[in-house]
Every structure is written in structure tokens, then in C-alpha cells.
């Protein structure tokens, strides 16, 4: 699973997920999976989508993951009263804004890429769309 090796602080405020995304262009591969909605992806969801894509392309081509879960999410244990401090870090998430390219792929045909991204999109909690690299 993806998570930072070390961080400046163990726990962070909840914060808000507003604004527009950076990394909106397909820059490494030829095809991409772009977020249409806003939300957050857990490290498990990112990995599940990656596995689905890798199996769909039968390990051909190359896949780039353009998101990284760098925000810790804390949870209190079951049946624990409120108060007594913030809970323990349970998992890591990446905050996603509309327009962010999540995955990229190269070395496969468009049909295979579309199929692989469709399988990956089924594993993700946000709406996505298929994009291709624009050459200028």
C-alpha cells in the first residue's frame, strides 16, 4: 500500500477539499483516467484500481500512478467515548479535485486501455473519464 515514509506531523486537521486540480494533463503516457468528481481515494482503492488495470493489459505496456495518499485519516476504536484526544491513524488518502489525472498508460492499444480504465474506474468512488494525450 502507498503511504509516506515519514511526515512532519503524525496527524492533520480534516480540512476541506476545494479548488481546482493540478496535474490535469496526460504527461507520461498516451492515455489517462481523469477525475470528473471531487473526493478522496484511499491507498487501498488506488492499489485495487492499479491491480485491475495491470491484469487487464496482461502486464503489457506501462502504467503510471499520478496520485499519492499523503493525508492521514484517524479513527477512534469501537465503543470508545468521545474526548480523550484524537484517534489513531488508520489509513491514508489522496484528496482529488475535478480534472486531476489519476492514472496514465502507454504501450497498449486504445481499446485495451479503455477496457482497463473501465475496470479501474469501477474500483474508485469518484466519477472518471477516459482522456488521450493532446499533441500540439
Curated annotation (Swiss-Prot):
Q: Which pairs of Cys residues are joined through disulfide bonds in the record?
A: none
Q: Which UniProt keywords apply?
A: Ribonucleoprotein, Ribosomal protein, RNA-binding, rRNA-binding, tRNA-binding
Q: Which GO terms describe its cellular component?
A: cytosolic large ribosomal subunit
Q: What is the annotated role of this protein in its UniProt record? A: Binds 23S rRNA and is also seen to make contacts with the A and possibly P site tRNAs.
InterPro entries according to UniProt:
Ribosomal_uL16, Ribosomal_uL16_bact-type, Ribosomal_uL16_CS, Ribosomal_uL16_dom, Ribosomal_uL16_sf
The residue range of the signal peptide is: none
- Family named by the database record: Belongs to the universal ribosomal protein uL16 family.
- What is the native source organism of this protein? Actinobacillus succinogenes (strain ATCC 55618 / DSM 22257 / CCUG 43843 / 130Z)
* GO molecular function per UniProt: rRNA binding; structural constituent of ribosome; tRNA binding
Q: Name one Pfam family in it.
A: Ribosomal_L16
Q: What Gene Ontology biological process does one annotation of this record name?
A: translation
Quaternary assembly: Part of the 50S ribosomal subunit.
State whether keyword Signal applies.
no
Q: Which residues cross the membrane?
A: none
Would you tell me the protein name for this molecule?
Large ribosomal subunit protein uL16
